[in-house]
Structures are given as C-alpha cells and as structure tokens.
Amino acid sequence: MSHEKSFLVSGDSYPPQNIVGPQAPMPPYVQAPYPGAPYPQAPFQPSPYGQPGYPHGPSPYPQGGYPQGPYPQGGYPQGPYPQSPFPPNPYGQPPPFQDPGSPQHGNYQEEGPPSYYDNQDFPAVNWDKNIRQAFIRKVFLVLTLQLSVTLSTVAIFTFVGEVKGFVRENVWTYYVSYAIFFISLIVLSCCGDFRRKHPWNLVALSILTVSLSYMVGMIASFYNTEAVIMAVGITTAVCFTVVIFSMQTRYDFTSCMGVLLVSVVVLFIFAILCIFIRNRILEIVYASLGALLFTCFLAVDTQLLLGNKQLSLSPEEYVFAALNLYTDIINIFLYILTIIGRAKE
C-alpha cells in the first residue's frame, strides 16, 4: 500500500498537490519556445539612478507629462487673514511641529527657562530704597540740630546786650573760633575713614557746629536786629524752596559740579578784590553772586543726598551730607545779611 507524501521534500521542484485546504495561486509556467532554449526573461526595468554596468532598455511605459486637468493650475488664493512668511529651512527639512499651547507659538520665542534671580531684584530695590530713606531722615535730623544751635546762638548774640557788647570788644575770639572751624572742616572733608567712624565723627561735627555758630552770631551782632531777622526769614524761604525744587525737578544739578567749582575760584578772586577796593556797590554785587552760587550748591548737595541723579552720596556719609547742607545754608544767610546790611547803610 502506497502513501502519497503530503509534505515538501528537499529537492522537489513543486509542492504536493493533495494538500488539504485552499491552495495559493501559482504563477503561470513559462514554457520555452523550443526544447533546449532558455527561459524568456522579463523585460528589464531601467534603474532610476543610472548605475553603470547594467544595460538600459526602453521603459515599458510611455514617459511624458501628466495631462492638463480641467481646472487651471495656479497658486492658492489668499485667505482672509494675512499669512506671515516663514524663513526657509536651509537643510530642506520640514519645520518642527509647534504646539499652539506652547509659549513658543507665534512670533514669541523664549530664549531659555525663566530666571528666578529676576524675582530677587524687587526685594533688593526695596531694601536700597529703605536704606536711602533712613539715610535722608538721619541727615535732616542732624541738620535740624545744627541749625537749631546756630539760630539760638544768633538770637543770643542779637537780643542780649551784654553778650553783644562782649563779642564786639573781644574780636580775637572770632579768630580762635575760625581756626577751630577750619581744622574740623579739613578733618571731616579730607579724612573719609574718620568721618565714618562713630562717635568721633559726631564729636568733630559738634565742634564744627559750635565754632561756626559762634562766628555767625558774632557777625550778626554787628548788624541791627531788623536786618538779622529779615536775613533769617529770607534764608529760610530760599532754602526751603530750593530743597523742594531739587526733589521734584528732573534736571540733574550734579552734572554742573565742575562749573560750580570754577565759579568758587572766581568768587574767591572777587573777594580779594573787594578787600582792597572798599565800595558798597561792589560788596553788594559780590554778596549777590555768593548767595546765588551757594544756592546752586544747595541744590547739588540736595540731589547728592537723594541719590536719584548721576552722582550720589553713600548712606554711610550722613555726617558729610549734613556738613555740606549746613555750610551751604550758613553761607546763604551770611551773604543775604551782607546784602541787607549794605543796602540799609
């Protein structure tokens, strides 16, 4: 009894024909035209890349353009919204996909992750502002004490006859107080470490205030009471106006520091001229220029105190700031007193 094989044996040309189930379609068998002839080859397809060493035959399909459609070809019509041009990709790659909800959608492009150091600027700004405000309050407190001492000394030397007579008879006390004032002024102006060292800076400032108050009171004792009172009132009005104006204006007076220093040299030469030429009109002109110059210095020193312009003082220099404002106000008072006194003669 013979059994037909139902599996493929190595060396067989064709699979068995009695396999159970549907059989896969077989390709048509190509017969040779005559015994011994080779099997016909399929037509050669030309290589699209034109490789050398392979024969190139004619393509079985006619080459040519696509037929023209019934609609005219052209660009797409412009939409109702203007389209923003995109720069071409230099490498011919398609543009990356952008999520409409991402922060880089549209023309906005974020360079990097948000910096948390930016949020720390606000406490620093508030901290600097608080320090500057405390510095301003301290300076005006010291200045108020200085002016109170000077005003009290001027009032005593003006309204008390015994004191007025004593200082008029003892002129040498003026030169002693001037020497003490000059030494303390040089120390506070030139020695930065000393004027920042507490409490010696306040001690030196107190010595300067007392000596200058004595000088101002002695000068005021040579004028009548009415002239002194008028000078005090005018000085108060001028200084208050200049300080308020310096706080509100946008003009930077600190940029004029060089011009003011040159003006001080010119005023000093003018003062030497007035010593040798005793003329009432010339002295009034000199006093007017001096009052105007130190009014400008008061504006500059006020803006240096505020710290909102090109130049500013360090919060550690509250003694130096008070010294500048105090000497400006005293010089304005003395020049105005000279103008009023010479005008009444």
Swiss-Prot record:
It holds the Pfam family Bax1-I. It is a multi-pass membrane protein. It comes from Mus musculus (Mouse). Potential apoptotic regulator. This is Protein lifeguard 1. Disulfide bonds: none annotated. Belongs to the BI1 family. LFG subfamily. GO terms for cellular component: endoplasmic reticulum; Golgi apparatus; Golgi membrane. Residues 24-46, 79-98 have a biased composition (Pro residues).
